[in-house]
Amino acid sequence: MNRQKQSFDNCFEVFLADTPETKKIHYELRYRVYCEEVGLEDKRRFPDQQEKDEWDNCAVHFLVRHRYTRQWLGGIRMVMHKGQVFPFQESGVAFERLSRDRYKNSVEISRLCIIKEARRFALRNTSVDVTEESRKISFLHDCGNMNRNIMWGLYRAAAIYSARNGIKHWYTLYNPALASLVKKQGFDVQQVGNASPRQSSREPYYLSVKKILENPLWLEDYRNDFRMYSDIDKEAGRRQVKQIGVVSYVARA
């Protein structure tokens, strides 16, 4: 099997969601996750079926879509501080306040979610001719693997954006399983606080943007740059956004 054809870069593309249309995609995806799938948010609060909050006005959003189907598969946001406060600090976690200078070049990573159809789209409409048995043993063989591939693609795009814009520090909330997954992939993840009763087992972690970009993971794949959706919009005119699928994975913050 030609695995190169099934690399992240050959199957997917990452966009900076810099238009109202693409931000709406993220909000709708989040609604499906947090309101319909997981039930972490009350859907009655979002009659327009867009899960969003006051932090979205000071956030940068990224989306992943499949190159061939144009299906949107996942998203993430980077939140800038507001009054020297990040969203996770309002959740009650035990966390030492950052210095004023530290806030200037830090962000919180949150609202990571990936749809269930990611695995199916990974092998659809590619130039690879694979048998049913080959599909079963493919390196994209389960949703867990695909979730990780898309997660790393989103991380890579967010890290590149961070470096270009003087952002040096990431803060995020992980549960133990997700923290372990990120560590196993070679990322230097440091726990910087403790969970609160409201956050269950999720605890605050720190990642250095410099060290994220030094991860050997990027040497083999994820080499393509993210694209600004507004540039695509200008080239092709208004695109109709495809309906997002059923969500199977979410890391909420």
PLM features: residue spans?
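Charge-patterned, long linear interaction tracts outside catalytic cores
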Residues: 247-253
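Generic structural motif
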Residues: 19, 67, 81, 117, ...
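Conserved donor-binding loop and adjoining core beta-sheet/short helix segment
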Residues: 44-101, 107-114
